[in-house]
């Protein structure tokens, strides 16, 4: 049972295995509780949630139509004494819209963890994303390119921060340090 001493409530669509390092670091260094969805339409390996100090609950992702889904028991979390809500920046999650609405009314801060703008959005997607992202207090996006595109769409640059991708950077450094130049590609393709 959550004691709500944490000031940050993280509600994500799922806890993927590749985000284990960043979630573990957040869990050990920040006052945050974690709530993860149970499944996606495309199966993906989940991390071991018990590794997190403040894993609170797995929420059921109920798919309604196409990619749109509702996260059961997520909306009630906005009425808990958290100060910040970190959500996937996914407009397909309909319960996130409701959380954003209530958070605004209750004067709570919301942060999107998202790819942001890709640059190939249709007019309909642009309108939906613009409305959705405008509901957040702040946006954490993966790249400067997304920030550039979103600022052209009217988003305030001061409310966006580039967090790069959430892959295991420390492990990638170790792997890259062991790599060496090879002719395997040019030899195989004769170029």
Explain the meaning of each model-derived region:
Residues 15, 89, 143-145:
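Helix N-cap/beta->alpha junction signal
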Residues 42, 84-106:
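An aromatic- and histidine-rich active-site surface loop
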Residues 72-81:
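Short, well-structured alpha-helical segments in soluble
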């Amino acid at each position: 049972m959550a004691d709500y001493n944490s000031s940050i409530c993280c509600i994500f669509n799922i806890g993927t295995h590749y985000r284990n390092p960043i979630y573990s670091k957040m869990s050990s260094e920040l006052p945050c509780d974690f709530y993860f969805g149970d499944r996606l339409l495309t199966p993906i390996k989940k991390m071991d949630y018990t590794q997190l100090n403040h894993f609170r609950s797995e929420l059921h992702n109920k798919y309604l139509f196409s990619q749109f889904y509702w996260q059961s028991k997520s909306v009630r979390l906005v009425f808990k004494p958290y100060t910040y809500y970190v959500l996937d920046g996914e407009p397909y999650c309909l319960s996130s819209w409701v959380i954003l609405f209530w958070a605004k009314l209750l004067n709570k801060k919301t942060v999107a963890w998202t790819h942001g703008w890709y640059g190939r959005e249709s007019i309909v997607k642009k309108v939906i994303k613009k409305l959705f992202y405008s509901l957040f207090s702040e946006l954490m996006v993966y790249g400067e390119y997304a920030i550039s595109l979103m600022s052209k769409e009217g988003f305030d640059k001061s409310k966006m921060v580039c967090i790069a991708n959430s892959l295991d950077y420390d492990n990638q450094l170790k792997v890259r340090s062991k790599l060496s130049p090879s002719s395997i590609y040019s030899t195989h393709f004769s170029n």
